[in-house]
Design a protein with these regions (language model features):
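NTP-dependent nucleotidyl-transfer catalytic core
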Residues: 17-261, 266-269, 276-288
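N-terminal chloroplast transit peptides
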Residues: 1-18
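Short glycine-centered helix-capping/turn motifs at secondary-structure transition points
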Residues: 13, 62, 80, 440-441, ...
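Conserved nucleotide- and phosphate/pyrophosphate-binding catalytic cores
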Residues: 270-501
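Extended hydrophobic/Leu-rich segments
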Residues: 8-9, 24-26, 30, 34, ...
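A broad, structure-centric signal for solvent-exposed, well-ordered loop/edge residues
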Residues: 8, 65, 71, 104, ...
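An N-terminal domain-start capping segment
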Residues: 2, 189-191, 369
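Serine/proline-rich low-complexity intrinsically disordered segments, especially terminal tails, linkers
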Residues: 8, 18-20, 29-31, 425, ...
């Protein structure tokens, strides 16, 4: 019955694709930039990605390093609805860019109708995963761990909600498809009532110590001077049981993780097989594992907390503007790789972006697209365009009136809390010195502001033609403001964005 429904779901997917228009309109967040460079997104580009087997597509995007039971998975993913999960332990306040790769795998499957179960390690986080570590993790206070759990749970939920909405703006077909379910889980749910004796009695006999000792992460720690504690040694058992529990309870078929999780994933698949045999289970569906590559730059630099260059997805830790600037500074060699991994633009469209970028690398067109895409993926559609506007005004010296609407500018700076307001009445009777004093809330004295005006450090707009040297100058709304709604003032290196009420 499940396979029949899945076949109908597949037919619906292909039928909806056939209804595409020749040229597809994307969100204004990215289409404005595309139009300037004559880039269009066509029906064929969208079909190309959606007609491709999901695993083949993910490999082409550079999101798959290894796959357990690959041939069976390729067939299964096209004939039935699967369940996938990946876990995140609460070792920090926020997920970071490196954590997004397994989430992107889940997202691609989810947008094609498969169910996903992002998992927060409320229980396993108390133990500590030794994978990829040469030393034992420091103990964490319980209240700190609970705070991390709450934060990361919210981040996981927000990511899938915002990324799904973002996907619909980059590929209109996504809006016509039946997207799979998204259900956040915490493994504390099934571990809190599990006693040690109960676990050993029921499951211990199905776990092989020789296999545990053969894991690379375990061997490395055993050979180290510090060794390994029993808590971290048994972590792989806990992760294996998580996979079994999710498989048995929610029909989760695939575990996704970093490449250092390969051994733990295989242990879970092995445990599922052993327990099914012991329980004489009628469920004969294959279980799978997918690992993602380590996220690095083209010159091999890692991303993450330990590397000291983590870009967090929590706005309180890394603002969306900082995300934009970080991606804007990406090297030319990394643009295609990162767009393939983190953007939901059709891959053929990405190829067009890269081709246009390569004709004039100094324009940094590719970096702008990447920065917009990353912001919209993490923080929601429109976030990237807002940061693009801010960046262009602050650094590119574009003609503001010709390139942006007043409402676009106000919205962009408002998101960063950088907009002041002044009434038309006050504006008409307030000279430039008093205006700057008011909107900067007395940050500088009036005498200091007067010296800056006379010294040529004050501009209206972002061009040299807007220099003001008369301390008694009164703003002319028709001449100085944008659409009579917005006034942009530059005081030294600082910009003031003023809404005219």
């Amino acid at each position: 019955m499940l396979r029949v429904r899945s076949h109908i779901w597949q037919q619906h997917r292909l039928l909806s694709l056939s209804l595409c228009r020749k040229n597809v309109q994307l969100s204004s967040s990215i289409s404005n930039l595309f139009e300037k460079h004559n880039i269009t997104v066509t029906e064929d580009e969208i079909k190309h990605d959606f007609n491709e087997p999901i695993l083949t597509h993910l490999k082409r995007r550079g999101l798959v390093e290894n796959c357990v039971n690959e041939e069976e998975l390729i067939k299964d993913a096209e004939t039935r609805k699967l369940g996938l999960y990946c876990g995140a332990d609460p070792t920090a306040k926020s997920l970071h860019l490196g954590n997004l790769l397994p989430l992107m795998v889940l997202l691609h499957f989810n947008l094609r109708g498969h169910n996903v179960y992002p998992l927060i390690g409320g229980a396993t986080g108390e133990v500590g995963d030794p994978s990829g570590r040469s030393t034992e993790r420091s103990a964490m206070a319980n209240n700190v761990r609970l705070d991390h759990i709450n934060r990361i749970s919210g981040q996981l939920s927000n990511f899938f909600r915002k990324a799904t909405d973002y996907g619909k703006t980059r590929n209109p077909e996504i809006a016509t498809l039946e997207i799979g379910s998204q259900e956040l889980k915490n493994n504390k749910e099934w571990w809190k009532d599990m006693g040690m004796l109960e676990f050993l009695a029921i499951y211990g006999k199905h776990i092989r110590v020789n296999q545990m000792l053969s894991r690379e992460s375990i061997k490395n720690r055993l050979q180290s001077e510090q060794g390994i504690g029993f808590n971290e040694f048994t972590y792989q058992i806990l992760q294996a049981y998580d996979f079994y529990y999710l498989n048995n309870t929610y029909g989760v078929d695939i575990q996704v993780g970093g490449n250092d999780q390969y051994g733990n994933i295989v242990a879970g698949i092995d445990l599922i097989g052993r327990l099914r045999k012991a329980e004489e289970s009628k469920n004969q569906n294959q279980s799978y594992g997918i690992t993602v590559p380590l996220l690095t730059t083209s010159n091999g630099v890692k991303f993450g907390k330990s590397a000291g260059n983590a870009i967090f997805i929590d706005k309180a830790l890394t603002s969306s503007y900082d995300v934009y600037q970080f991606m804007y500074n990406t090297t030319d060699e990394d643009i295609k790789r990162f767009l393939y991994k983190f953007s939901l633009l059709p891959t053929k469209t990405i190829d067009k972006v890269v081709d246009v970028h390569n004709t004039d690398k100094k324009s940094r067109f590719g970096q702008r697209v990447l920065a917009i895409e990353m912001c919209d993926l993490i923080h929601g559609d429109g976030e990237g365009f807002s940061n693009y506007i801010i960046s262009e005004i602050l650094f590119s010296k574009v003609n503001i009136k010709e390139n942006f609407k007043a409402d676009e500018i106000l919205n962009a700076f408002d998101k960063q809390g950088l907009v002041s307001s002044v009434s038309k009445t006050d504006l008409a009777s307030t000279n430039i010195v008093n205006l700057l004093y008011k909107i900067n809330e007395g940050e500088k004295s009036k005498s200091e502001l007067k010296r800056m005006v006379k010294g040529g450090s004050v501009y209206i707009g972002n061009t040299k033609e807007g220099k003001v040297t008369d301390a008694e100058y009164l703003i002319d709304i028709e001449k100085d403001a944008i659409e009579s709604k917005l006034l942009l003032l530059k005081l030294g290196k600082k910009y003031n964005v003023v809404r005219i009420d």
